[in-house]
């Protein structure tokens, strides 16, 4: 299957989708009292998410009645920053991010010996609807000069956007 290239940006969807992602991420049952913030990390620890491109339009159809249907995606990544140096601590971070990714993709995950599964994606406003969430594998970056290390989980939300031109 050929990968679609962006043909534009869903600029008006940036705030809508970003807010929904922040709320969804903070519903993850494995947070244990922690919060995932938007583009805000401490020097040595924290969990945040960021999107370097914002929402992108991949395809667009305009009907003869000027009804527009766009296929869009919102690529983002979750960053887990830590000063952990032991292998088992790093494996716990990798497991946390992998479980978060599975949960976002509606796969069952085990947290504290209980199974959780996301049943439905959050509703978006302004005629946008999430159709699918996909993820890649989490990975660690090279440690910073202060010995903190960032672990990344790339995620992509696919959604539709419908509106009338008139």
Predicted regions and their residues:
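Amphipathic, interaction-prone secondary-structure segments
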Residues: 40-62
